[in-house]
């Protein structure tokens, strides 16, 4: 097993405020419109973490169901966080006819900000180097760790290790312009368009760590009834007192500060053009076109010494597409498509930046990869559909995806990035060579006159990716985060003011990581790869329409109290076990 084990408890409160305003004005040749919206999310989070690290195996004590350890480094961590996220956008456009062409020019601006600068995170530590502890994994989903010396739980023995304060403000802005024009000709409806998008992401991430000579006993220790029977969750510091340390920073000693290494700015410019023609006749429709886009990205960040690090990339993408719909009868339709798709990596993955932590000489973290390429796919789709009376619908579909540059996380046990030598794992990202996904999809929907309806869907897939490390060897893995089986079944009632839906959603297990914290990706195997176990969730949604403007809504999520389980290689090797509980909400919508 890994040499550390941790339990976490979360309390999260979220408040959301949203406002939208739209204006339409009719003119001689069409319609002018202005659309605006503003959303604000305020999160309040408490996290208690109870961690036992540096677990050393006593020779000869390991069995199929447990082991004994001769060392436990106990960390009890209390984190309090208040975060505000805002998102606003304004769009101005026109839709109408000019010179026989239908046009729709649009100019938009959006701005998002995430402010996570109001927080406090304190770790208390006790290191028992000569005390035996027992670890029982007879139930691999609920491992039990039992120290023989209970003083490891004593708040007076848990010394104040550090107070970590972070000030993270992330700003994301985008200015976009697009215009499309279409005209009906003898060969169908011809359409062409242009879009230009300029986006900037600016992350200012400051961290400062303080020390103090005190123990948890001075912070009103709290106890928690843990959900796993037989397992003790250590006392934790009062979150109000932890957050109150923000008013006492002048009395604390600064141990470490970093105002640069996590900062970065990325600017992305995308220009795209397309042409498309839609041809229809009594037996079908053919839509054919092509799209070309050019993307340039410029990033700046800092190395360990505060020197500016620059990175740039340019990428062009050509995407032809053909979509065919053929009406076999009034009720049967055959569809086929060949098209290209593109997905760009996130800015945090491509910026030349570091995010690292030094824990008494154990340096871990993550590093961006400016050489990361966008994910490209050629897609093939074929389906047969039946449209019956009312809600009756049946379909069967086949699909294939030929993928280039699929993006995977990669873990190095030791490596050096931007002058920082990591010796306790560093995560970065890497492109695979070629990947393929083949799939089959079945859909069924049927409704009765009394308002009751049934819907079901099942998708079967088979995907894999190929890697070629620097040593010239190659290996193949399952496609990441792709479940071989996925299905959902819904039973509902939709008539009059009532809209009720009971749904069950299922997926099989899938690959999450290619290697664990002790192995590099070049040594990948099933035993050191992380998987997510199969999962089924049952949800209920009920809506009642009081009037045209007012609607009541009730939601029950995860009614079966399903847990999420992650494991290394096989289900007997725990990686992570999450209990979310059931969630209920009541709300109403009013339109005016």
Model-derived features: positions:
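Transmembrane beta-barrel wall of Gram-negative outer-membrane proteins
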Residues: 1-54, 75, 83-93, 99, ...
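C-terminal beta-signal and adjacent terminal beta-strands/loops
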Residues: 506-522, 543-592
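Transmembrane beta-strands of outer-membrane beta-barrel pores
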Residues: 27, 38-42, 86, 98, ...
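Gram-negative outer-membrane beta-barrel transporters
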Residues: 400-402, 414, 419-517, 555, ...
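Repeated loop/turn-to-beta-strand initiation elements of outer-membrane beta-barrel proteins
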Residues: 29-32, 100-103, 187-190, 283-286, ...
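Signature of Gram-negative outer-membrane beta-barrel scaffolds
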Residues: 4-6, 39-45, 159-164, 168, ...
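Hydrophobic, lipid-facing positions within transmembrane beta-strands of outer-membrane proteins
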Residues: 15-21, 86-92, 173-179, 269-275, ...
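Outer-membrane beta-barrel signature, preferentially recognizing the C-terminal barrel domain
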Residues: 72-87, 262-269, 342-395, 400-403, ...
């Amino acid at each position: 097993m890994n040499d550390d084990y941790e339990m976490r408890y979360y309390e999260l409160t979220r408040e959301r405020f949203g406002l939208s305003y739209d204006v339409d004005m009719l003119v001689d040749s069409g319609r002018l419109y202005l659309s605006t919206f503003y959303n604000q999310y305020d999160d309040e989070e408490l996290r208690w973490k109870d961690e036992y690290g540096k677990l050393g195996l006593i020779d000869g004590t390991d069995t199929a169901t447990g082991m004994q350890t001769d060392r436990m480094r106990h960390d009890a961590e209390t984190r309090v966080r208040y975060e505000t996220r805002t998102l606003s956008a304004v769009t101005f456009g026109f839709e109408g006819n000019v010179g026989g062409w239908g046009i729709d020019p649009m100019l938009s601006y959006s701005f998002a900000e995430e402010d996570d600068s109001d927080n406090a995170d304190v770790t208390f530590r006790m290191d028992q180097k000569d005390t035996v502890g027992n670890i029982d994994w007879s139930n691999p989903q609920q491992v039990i760790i039992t120290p023989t010396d209970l003083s490891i739980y004593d708040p007076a023995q848990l010394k104040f290790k550090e107070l970590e304060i972070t000030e993270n403000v992330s700003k994301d802005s985008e200015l976009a312009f697009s215009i499309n024009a279409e005209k009906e000709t003898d060969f169908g409806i011809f359409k062409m368009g242009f879009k230009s998008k300029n986006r900037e992401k600016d992350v200012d991430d400051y961290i400062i760590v303080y020390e103090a000579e005190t123990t948890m006993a001075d912070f009103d220790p709290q106890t928690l009834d843990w959900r796993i029977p037989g397992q003790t969750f250590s006392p934790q510091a009062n979150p109000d007192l932890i957050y109150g340390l923000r008013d006492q920073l002048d009395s604390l000693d600064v141990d470490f500060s970093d105002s640069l290494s996590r900062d970065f700015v990325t600017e992305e410019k995308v220009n795209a053009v397309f042409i498309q023609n839609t041809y229809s006749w009594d037996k079908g429709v053919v839509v054919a076109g092509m799209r070309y886009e050019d993307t340039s990205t410029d990033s700046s960040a800092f190395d360990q010494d505060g020197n500016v690090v620059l990175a740039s990339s340019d990428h062009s993408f050509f995407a032809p597409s053909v979509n065919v719909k053929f009406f076999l009868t009034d009720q049967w339709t055959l569809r086929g498509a060949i098209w290209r798709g593109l997905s760009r990596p996130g800015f945090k993955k491509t910026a030349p930046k570091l995010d690292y932590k030094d824990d008494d000489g154990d340096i871990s973290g993550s590093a961006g990869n400016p050489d990361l390429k966008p994910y490209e796919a050629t897609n093939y789709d074929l389906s047969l559909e039946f449209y019956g009376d009312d809600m009756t619908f049946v379909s069967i579909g086949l699909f294939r995806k030929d993928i280039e540059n699929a993006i995977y996380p990669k873990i190095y046990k030791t490596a050096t990035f931007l002058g920082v030598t990591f010796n306790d794992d560093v995560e970065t990202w890497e492109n695979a060579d070629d990947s393929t996904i083949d799939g089959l999809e079945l859909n069924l929907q049927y409704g009765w006159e009394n308002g009751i309806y049934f819907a079901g869907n099942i998708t079967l897939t088979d995907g894999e990716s190929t890697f070629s490390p620097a040593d010239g060897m190659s290996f193949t893995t399952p496609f990441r985060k792709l479940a071989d089986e996925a299905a959902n079944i819904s039973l509902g009632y939709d008539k009059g003011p009532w809209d009720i839906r009971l749904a069950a959603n299922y997926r099989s297990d899938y690959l999450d990581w290619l290697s664990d914290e002790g192995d590099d990706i070049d040594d990948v195997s099933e035993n050191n790869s992380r998987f997510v176990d199969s999962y089924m969730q049952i949800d209920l949604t009920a809506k009642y329409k009081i009037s045209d403007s007012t609607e009541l809504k009730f939601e029950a999520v995860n009614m079966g109290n399903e847990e999420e389980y992650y494991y290394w290689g096989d289900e007997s090797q725990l990686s992570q076990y999450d209990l979310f509980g059931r969630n209920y909400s009541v709300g109403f919508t009013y339109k005016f």
